[in-house]
Regions:
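Active-site-adjacent bridging/hinge elements
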Residues: 69-82, 106-108, 169-178
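Alpha-helical bundle segments that constitute or directly flank the non-heme di-iron/ferroxidase center
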Residues: 8, 85-115, 132-138
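Long, hydrophobic, well-ordered secondary-structure blocks that form the structural core
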Residues: 111-177
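Extreme N-terminal leader/anchor segments
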Residues: 6-74, 83, 87, 118-124
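Short, small-residue-biased leader/transition segments that mark boundaries at the very start
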Residues: 1-8, 181
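Charged/polar, solvent-exposed surface patches and flexible loops
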Residues: 3, 56, 60, 64, ...
Length: 181
């Protein structure tokens, strides 16, 4: 495993993360690269892969693209109005937790993994993954905007909920450990 974690020499144009650059001007044979900690990425080539599974996963994720606004929530609004106060609490708490989780998943993979990524197909897969998490979060926002007259009343309480904060800690601590290596 020792060679897997060795970094390439750093040029002055590279960032604080050893080996990372926005665009490597040297040709890199990504078919022979490790998934992580290889040479910095160059041209995003999607014609040859070391791991074609990541490209298939990227294509599959892109096929799931949708916009929350494309779905009518008129029935949901009426159904929500019929819930008991306890059911509304569970419904809202779940949405708040999902928004927190998707907020993390919408940014953490890029912050934690992409700086060390050595394969364009993996970089693309993680980028699309983050994008899909943002779509999820937007869908929860769309639901809240449709069932509450003042959505800010809900959003403003997310960071005041100790249950959500403790769950966020369990999700974010590993990402933060990697980011702060």
């Amino acid at each position: 495993l020792g060679d897997v974690y060795k970094r390439q020499p750093v040029s002055p144009a590279q960032s604080d993360i050893t080996g990372m650059t926005v665009f490597n001007k040297k040709a890199v044979d990504t078919a022979k690269q490790y998934m992580f900690f290889g040479a910095p990425l160059s041209v995003q080539r999607y014609d040859s892969y070391r791991y074609p599974t990541f490209d298939r996963l990227t294509q599959q994720q892109l096929g799931y693209f949708w916009r929350p606004e494309e779905v009518s929530l008129q029935k949901d609004r009426a159904d929500y109005a019929q819930l008991t106060e306890q059911q509304k609490h569970i419904f809202t708490s779940n949405l708040k937790y999902q928004i927190m989780l998707d907020s993390v998943q919408g940014r953490a993979p890029g912050m934690a993994f992409i700086p060390f990524c050595s394969l364009p197909e993996l970089e693309a897969c993680m980028t699309v993954w983050q994008f899909m998490e943002m779509i999820h979060s937007r869908s929860y926002t769309y639901i809240i905007k449709n069932v509450y007259s003042n959505p800010s009343d809900i959003f403003d309480t997310i960071l005041e909920d100790n249950n959500i904060l403790s769950r966020a800690e369990s999700v974010t601590k590993s990402y933060l450990s990697l980011i702060h290596i």
